[in-house]
């Protein structure tokens, strides 16, 4: 009963209005009130401020400044093995695995269309049919900048307007084509592991999506698909990013989806749904390496995993079931 009510709210609530209101409030300088909100947020979600470059919450003028806070360099070491692709974000893996022709797993028993995710771009979809995908959810407690899994040359970016459904266990189980319906920014890269797409998916109260090369992509929300292209290689105007380098960020966060071409990478065996991710740890390994590297994510403290799962709505809450 309670789950049905929550799901109904996803369709009834004015999500765009709520998102605009949240974005407006998060950008305001409110002095002591801003600090109070940040302190309450840190306490409720168990945010580890020791990892931040500025651990003192009084140093943030707005909630947005706090939310996209940079981390100290040493807290997210990047796996330097050239055959290893690394995790692009802190969070929890929602789903991962093989793209079955044109189908991507959203939740148990629920798939969505690769072409729909890519806004009907069948040429781009052809690059990833029968390839590999990873969906990473960023909970409120997480670091909300997104980094590169490997070296890449940006070739194309597409902004796709859409809904702003929440991204959680309940909606994943009940909202068809959730990630293909929500607002998103698709980034296509040339890499030494073949083409790679990194998709930043919006949700309710995600105030904006930004990239390091173009700044704020949304808002404004104009309701039309926008497409940009860049030259290859070392041509004038090309955008090259290194493994582990920041590529974008959420102001109030959501989900990152990675797509890899077929036969190019193998996901790290230890990873599964609800695995906790940390930027720089191994995500996948090239299929062309002759010696399989030691690509196992470093074990995390039990309290860190528990805090991440507590903050993640991907974890089914049995108390809500009636």
Curated annotation (Swiss-Prot):
InterPro entries associated with the record: PS_Dcarbxylase, PSD-B, PSD_type1_pro
Pathway recorded for this protein: Phospholipid metabolism; phosphatidylethanolamine biosynthesis; phosphatidylethanolamine from CDP-diacylglycerol: step 2/2
GO terms for MF: phosphatidylserine decarboxylase activity
GO cellular component, one term: plasma membrane
The protein's enzyme class: lyase
Cofactor mode of binding and number, as noted: Binds 1 pyruvoyl group covalently per subunit.
Segments for region (Disordered): 293-322
Catalytic site: 90 (charge relay system), 147 (charge relay system), 254 (charge relay system), 254 (schiff-base intermediate with substrate)
Record's bilayer topology term: Peripheral membrane protein
Chief location category: membrane
Keywords: Cell membrane, Decarboxylase, Lipid biosynthesis, Lipid metabolism, Lyase, Membrane, Phospholipid biosynthesis, Phospholipid metabolism, Pyruvate, Zymogen
Top-level taxon of origin: Bacteria
Localization per Swiss-Prot or TrEMBL: Cell membrane
Cited function: Catalyzes the formation of phosphatidylethanolamine (PtdEtn) from phosphatidylserine (PtdSer).
PANTHER family: PHOSPHATIDYLSERINE DECARBOXYLASE, PHOSPHATIDYLSERINE DECARBOXYLASE PROENZYME, MITOCHONDRIAL
Subunit description: Heterodimer of a large membrane-associated beta subunit and a small pyruvoyl-containing alpha subunit.
Protein name per its UniProtKB record: Phosphatidylserine decarboxylase proenzyme
Protein encoded by which gene: psd
């Amino acid at each position: 009963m309670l789950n049905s009510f929550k799901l109904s709210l996803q369709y009834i609530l004015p999500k765009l209005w709520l998102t605009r209101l949240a974005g407006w409030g998060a950008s305001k300088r409110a002095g002591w009130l801003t600090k109070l909100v940040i302190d309450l947020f840190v306490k409720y979600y168990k945010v580890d401020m020791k990892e931040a470059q500025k651990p003192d919450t009084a140093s943030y003028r707005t909630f947005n400044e706090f939310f996209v806070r940079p981390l100290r360099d040493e807290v997210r070491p990047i796996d330097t093995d050239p055959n290893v692709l690394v995790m692009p974000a802190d969070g929890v893996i929602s789903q991962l695995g093989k793209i079955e022709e044109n189908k991507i797993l959203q939740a148990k028993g629920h798939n969505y269309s690769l072409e729909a995710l890519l806004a009907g771009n069948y040429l781009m979809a052809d690059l990833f049919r029968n390839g590999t995908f990873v969906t990473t959810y960023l909970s409120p407690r997480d670091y909300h900048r997104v980094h590169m899994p490997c070296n890449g040359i940006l070739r194309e970016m597409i902004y796709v307007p859409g809904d702003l459904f929440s991204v959680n266990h309940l909606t994943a189980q009940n909202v068809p084509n959730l990630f293909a319906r929500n607002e998103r920014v698709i980034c296509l890269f040339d890499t030494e592991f073949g083409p790679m797409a990194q998709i930043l998916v919006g949700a309710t109260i995600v105030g904006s999506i930004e990239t390091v090369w173009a700044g704020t992509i949304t808002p404004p929300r104009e309701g039309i698909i926008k497409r940009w292209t860049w030259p290859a290689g070392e041509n004038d105007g090309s955008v090259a990013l290194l493994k582990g380098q920041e590529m974008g960020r959420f102001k109030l966060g959501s989900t990152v989806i990675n797509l890899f071409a077929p036969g190019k990478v193998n996901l790290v065996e230890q990873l599964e749904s609800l695995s906790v991710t940390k930027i720089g740890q191994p995500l996948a390994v090239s299929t062309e390496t002759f010696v399989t590297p030691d690509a196992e994510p470093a074990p995390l403290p039990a309290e860190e995993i528990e805090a991440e799962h507590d903050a993640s709505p991907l974890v089914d809450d049995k108390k809500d079931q009636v």
